[in-house]
Amino acid sequence: MTSIETTVVKVGIADLKIIQFPQLIRTSGLGSCVGTVIYDDKKEIAGLSHVLLPYSQQGKQANTNPYKYADTAISYLYNELLKRGANQSSLKAKLAGGAQMFQLRTGSDLMRIGPRNVESVELALAEFGIPIVSKDVGGNLGRTIEFDPRSKLLAVRKINQEVIMI
């Protein structure tokens, strides 16, 4: 019997990557940021996006990193997965993050970055018809996540808590 050696591909803030088994994919530093995994339920291919902000407001800044924003990163992730052989009808999503890291005394919606990131990711996924299978969002704790494209499990590690599998 041959053992399969897995490697972990790390995704930074405002970044995204695509993997195939035997690779795993991980991102850390998810406070108000949202980690979105889109995967093909029938193949062993997946992508992970680590978004920082909800909307790109394109046109205000030249040369903006599209992976930084939920509205543009999800589109890039979706299209890249299709280019790599994923089947649109088999795509599913899991997400984590979107915490409210600081107590705010203002009622301003602009400062609710975590919840706004989650809403923007959910809207972008809905636009592409990608169902969200599971999520671990909100609260006030940072997260690290790791996805296995073979088992389709997302390990979510919160600070000072046990790992949960979603």
Curated annotation (Swiss-Prot):
Pfam families: CheD (PF03975). It catalyses: L-glutaminyl-[protein] + H2O = L-glutamyl-[protein] + NH4(+). Disulfide bonds: none annotated. One of its GO terms (biological process) is chemotaxis. GO terms for molecular function: protein-glutamine glutaminase activity. It comes from the Bacteria. InterPro entries: CheD-like_sf, Chemorcpt_Glu_NH3ase_CheD, Cytotoxic_necrot_fac-like_cat. Keywords: Chemotaxis, Hydrolase. Its EC number is 3.5.1.44. CDD domains: CheD. The keyword Hydrolase applies. Belongs to the CheD family. PANTHER family: CHEMORECEPTOR GLUTAMINE DEAMIDASE CHED-RELATED. HAMAP family: CheD. Probably deamidates glutamine residues to glutamate on methyl-accepting chemotaxis receptors (MCPs), playing an important role in chemotaxis. This is Probable chemoreceptor glutamine deamidase CheD. It comes from Oceanobacillus iheyensis (strain DSM 14371 / CIP 107618 / JCM 11309 / KCTC 3954 / HTE831). The gene is cheD.
